[in-house]
Amino acid sequence: LSQLKQLNKDILGQEKGIHQMIETFQHKQLPISFFIYGPTSCGKTLTAKSLAKYLNYHYLKLDMNQYQESHSLYKLLETYHEKPSLLLSTLQSYPHTVLLLDHIDQACEEIIHLFSQIFDDGYYEDQAKRKISFENVVFIMSQTGTSRCCMGFKKSRQTKYLKHELFDKVDQIIEYQPLSKEIIEKIIHLREHISIEKIHNLLKEEHIPINLSKMMKQIKQMS
């Protein structure tokens, strides 16, 4: 667990959220589940990747907007024509996995309900009576949005269902903050390979007025 303190070096500007995550690991046994919400490009995906790195776990990202229909459940968890499901084949090879359920709010209700059961039971039994164990899995569910949106104030049926099914089941709900101008400058300085397009989108998302050309010149002078 001491390795997890390194997360603050990778995830800049989210000290409170990282502290909540480390505390959860100190007091809870696997499987562990987190729900992380916040604006775009604030570190949600990077958190899952870095967590897998420091735990020495396999990393798997599922984009849940690909699972909006109920039939997509079979591709995810059911064996079809003797072909193992995505999660069965992954967890058979890598029982210790950090599983990122990205944009969890876009998944169909059947999948949300199913994962809420997995959080309770620690396993899933498919139609062929094969058990998929999730006992050594770290779940990270992510959603882009503000606290009012993600915590159930948004009048959407899907968000209400998500709140009802999952929020009482997850071990920790973490809010990530928008990145300040100073943090973004630090990220750019530390990661010189970051694309100009990504920087532009990040600044636009956070409504931060900044002279990008001037900043890049300053960074080159500092290097």
Where are these regions (language model features)?
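Conserved AAA+/SF3 P-loop NTPase catalytic/coupling segment centered on the Walker-B
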Residues: 69-73, 92-120, 137-138, 145-152, ...
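Conserved Walker
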Residues: 29-31, 85-90, 121-136, 150-151, ...
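Walker A/P-loop
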Residues: 30-62
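Conserved RecA-like P-loop NTPase ATPase core
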Residues: 13, 21, 45, 52, ...
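AAA+/P-loop NTPase substrate/partner-engagement loops
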Residues: 54-80
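Pre-Walker A (pre-P-loop) alpha-helix and adjacent loop at the N terminus of AAA/AAA+ ATPase modules
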Residues: 2-34
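Conserved AAA+ ATPase small/helical "lid" subdomain
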Residues: 170-188, 192-223
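Conserved AAA+ ATPase "SRH/arginine-finger" region at the nucleotide-binding site
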Residues: 62-67, 143-144, 158-160, 171-185
